[in-house]
Amino acid sequence: MFKAEARWLRCALEAFPPERLSPLLNLGSSSVEVREGIQPWIEDQVFIPLRARNVEVVHVDMRELPGVDVQADLTDPADLRRLRALRPRALLCCNLLERVIEPDRLARHCLDLVAAGGLLFVTVPFSYPYHSDPIDTMYRPNPAQLAELLCGTRLLDSTILGTGVSYRNAVRKRPWLLLRHLWRLPIPFVSFEKWQRSMARLYWLAAEYRITCAVFEKL
């Protein structure tokens, strides 16, 4: 999650009173080390303000990791029932939809977790290179496409957010990264898919990464 993305989430969450948010499920939460150590702005901008307003946050991930409150697979009916039993009023679904083969299925399962009036805070890359963790389907929707995916909801707020970060930032820290592109340039036949990804990444030397951010209410 980018710093600008975390700041946007803070503002989006602050637009609602605590009783509209609590309990809140943070889907695909990753570990406490990621939230507080590697990307501490997630904790500072999102979860500290929520706790200050007495919003109960439940961190959910399919992996057993430190800081995960509920280990659950969002494609498993039994796990979905366990999550639904928590009676969440809101969900964070951040940078998940591009990591599943069937984003429409994941969207349906997310909607099934909340009752009518439940809130979904969704972020997904809009302009960003391939990043496998563990997979990336290159799903890059705009807000309208995201609204089509989450049918049965009302779009309350959305933006395509500039992060102020680009591939230049990585290259400044590790200039040798450019050597990878130079090495691959004349040999696309070795692995054409990897060659395409390598050449495409150069676009973000000039362009910033952008994120689709949206808030939905279940009808």
Name each model-derived stretch.
Residues 14-18, 49-50, 204-206:
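A general structural signal for short secondary-structure junctions and capping/turn motifs
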Residues 1-21:
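Class I SAM-dependent methyltransferase Rossmann-like catalytic core
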Residues 1-8, 33-40, 153-163:
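Short N-terminal helix-initiation segments at or just after the protein's N-terminus
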Residues 101-111, 116-219:
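S-adenosyl-L-methionine-dependent methyltransferase catalytic module, highlighting the catalytic core
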Residues 9-12, 46, 167:
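Generic structural signal of hydrophobic/aromatic residues within well-ordered alpha-helices
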Residues 22-132, 144-147, 216-217:
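Conserved SAM-binding loop
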